[in-house]
Curated annotation (Swiss-Prot):
Belongs to the GrpE family. Keywords: Chaperone, Cytoplasm, Stress response. Its main location: cytoplasm. Homodimer. This is Protein GrpE.
């Protein structure tokens, strides 16, 4: 009788075990979909991390560039304020002392001062705008159009006021006359 009970129990146990293994397989499938979902989330989070990190690096580079620009152009207002001084010195240097020794010494002193100004300007990134080439509206300001036999149309005939740049940026455009 106990054998009969065992035999009767055996077939019943096997289907239960199969059902259990089916549920394990379903659980495993559920775990696999959870793993896939978690892997997808991990991929999205990793992508967001890389994007945020790249954005941070771009902001950092932009900040460094702005910081360098501020340092580079910090003297811009001061240099602009000095331009009328050097203009006045250059006008003073254009006078003809004739035979007056005292006037010659004054002119010599003015020329030395102008050279010191130019060296100081160069040291701080200030340079003169060339006026011996074609007219460039980005750096020249045409105040006159004149007829010229020596220059072609669009070329600068005469510089009326020197222009200056500071580290590649126009500090003051050159005032020029341009050939028709």
């Amino acid at each position: 009788m106990s054998e009969e009970v065992k035999e009767q129990n055996l077939p019943e146990v096997e289907p239960v075990q199969e059902a259990a293994s089916d549920s394990v397989n379903l659980d495993a499938l559920g775990d696999i979909s959870k793993v896939e979902k978690l892997e997808k989330e991990l991929g999205e989070i990793t992508d967001k991390y890389y994007r945020a990190n790249a954005e941070f690096e771009n902001i950092k580079k932009r900040y460094e560039k702005e910081k360098a620009d501020v340092a580079s152009y910090a003297n811009e207002k001061f240099a602009r304020d000095l331009l009328p001084v050097i203009d006045a010195l250059e006008i003073a240097a254009n006078f003809d002392p004739e035979d007056d020794e005292f006037a010659k010494k004054i002119k010599e002193g003015i020329l030395i001062t102008i050279n010191q100004f130019k060296k100081c300007f160069e040291k701080h990134g200030v340079s003169e705008i060339a006026t011996d080439a074609d007219f460039d509206p980005n750096v020249h300001n045409a105040v006159l159009r004149v007829d010229s036999e020596e220059k072609q149309s669009g070329q600068i005939v005469q510089a009326l006021q020197k222009g200056y740049m500071i580290n590649g940026r126009v500090l003051r455009p050159a005032m020029v006359s341009v050939a028709n």
